[in-house]
Amino acid sequence: MHHHPITLLSLLLGAAQSIAAHPTAHDERRSSSSIGVSASVPDDAALPVLHPFVSFSIEFAFFPDFAGNLSHPNLFSNQLLDNLADLQGAKPYIRVGGNTQDFALYDPKLRAATNATYITSISTDYPLILSFGPAFFESYFTWPGTKFIHGFNLGKNSSSDIELMLESVPLACKALEGGKLAYWELGNEPDLYKTSAQGIRRPASWTEQDYVDEWLNKTARIEKRLVEACPELAESKYIAPSFAGVTNSLNPVVTWEKGLDKSRNIALNSEHNYIGGATQPGVTLQNTLMNHTKTVESVAQQVNVSRILSKDNLTPGIPYILGETNSLYNEGAPGLSNSFGAALWGVDFNLYCASQNIRRTHMHQGSNYNYISWQPVGTNRTTIGTKAPYYGNAMVAAMLHGGDDVRIVNLPLAADTEAAYAAYVNETLVRVAVINLVEFNYTSTDSTAEKVESRPSAKYTFQLPSSESVYAGSVSVQRLMANGSNAITGITWDGWSYNYELAQGKPVRLQNVTTGEAISVGDDGVVEIEIPYSSAAILSL
């Protein structure tokens, strides 16, 4: 499925006027506002996103669930990745890592892919004792055309554990030969090693300099193994430092100042971000996830670090990405992270990141997690299937279609509960996205007519750029829809369902959803669109 053709391109050539959007609503409590958007890329716009932008991080212990193996490849997962490739133009990059990356020890005699032991008093979500064998690397052969980031263990630090990590290098590099390797990673969230509830990994005296020295030493030892086993990958690079946040026990700016990139082997500056915690007091759908201001505040911490690093020339030519991110840390909260409201949050969060020079995002996944985009296998806790957040991934991918020169610009709106963005491809405006974040819940006892009747909508008015050309008659519309923000099923992007039950993740056009929608443009270039509460849309020019 590809984006709609650009039908107003002639309007944009040489256009000098702005777009003005005036959101109004049936609900008179909401104030109207107006904004302007230039037809060409604003001077202060972010850099183009990396291609692909929409990417994933998969918990190390659960990678075999998501990808399968040579005899049983996970075709469902691969189909969902292919769908996103069709939308954004490139298959998502996959980072294999997370907390269990730093628990995982290589066992050359293990016949299974993994051997996992849960310590339920600490975490029921993932194993704290984990070994992986040669069969683990079969999972790198099941998703054609996918590039991977493989995570090595930095957390375990005895001489025998380090040797086991190094013994795994030849298997990893041979599995990722032939264009499958994107980057390596060494360590997950080392800024929590001194404080983690899952176990203390380093003494309180461990500093940024200690971390940098250790990272440089171990990556040099990894490089020696690469030279021996996979010489063509000897100069492959890393994402780093993979900190949990920017305000923990290691300071990311100091870490770069201490020479993290002394070996010139870091391709991307990777940090992690979560809006809040699954069990934090006061976390709600409306105030935490469906809240544009909260998203802006969360991303602002990353942007501040990014600007300092840039100003001090500490990361020249090294893009800033989120190598792991999602809604609520500790695997998300049921009823929040798995709802359609979380899908809308994902659209807002990802597009806002793209507008702030965060060049790629890897949404974190793990079997049975609440915030996952899909559950790859059936378990006694979760059924196999496409989950609500995936549909948000699809809309973001569609908004970012266009190759290597796609830029996103935030269009500030008045309320916490709405957001809008413009997409520019090759310097030209091609799409506008509008997200309504007013929480609208529904109950299964409502009839379909009652649901439609009772659901308010907001009206957004755009003034399209003008030129001497004649205005095209209409713009095309694609909508992200569900019955309400609390829905966990029945979700569509542009009328497509990606449900496992319908066609194992292949796109299926539902007949009860309006598609092919076009909105007429007035002679004066004004176009109006109604966005039901708790929904979103893309207008393609």
From Swiss-Prot:
Top-level division of the source organism's lineage: Eukaryota
Temperature dependence as stated in the record: Optimum temperature is 45 degrees Celsius.
A cellular component term, taken from the record's GO annotations: extracellular region
pH dependence: Optimum pH is 3.0-4.0.
Disulfide pattern: none
Catalytic residues (UniProt): 208, 324
Signal peptide: 1-20
Compartment annotation: Secreted
Reaction it catalyzes: a beta-D-glucuronoside + H2O = D-glucuronate + an alcohol
Alphabetized UniProt keyword annotations: Glycoprotein, Hydrolase, Secreted, Signal
Main location: secreted
Post-translational modification: N-glycosylated.
GO MF: beta-glucuronidase activity
Keyword Signal: yes
Function: Beta-glucuronidase that hydrolyzes beta-glucuronosyl and 4-O-methyl-beta-glucuronosyl residues of arabinogalactan-protein. Hydrolyzed heparan sulfate only very weakly. Has no activity on xylan from birchwood. Able to catalyze the transglycosylation of glucuronic acid (GlcA) residues from p-nitrophenyl-beta-glucuronic acid (PNP beta-GlcA) to various monosaccharide acceptors such as glucose, galactose and xylose.
Family: Belongs to the glycosyl hydrolase 79 family.
Name of the protein in its database record: Beta-glucuronidase
Lineage, top ranks: Eukaryota, Fungi, Dikarya, Ascomycota, Pezizomycotina
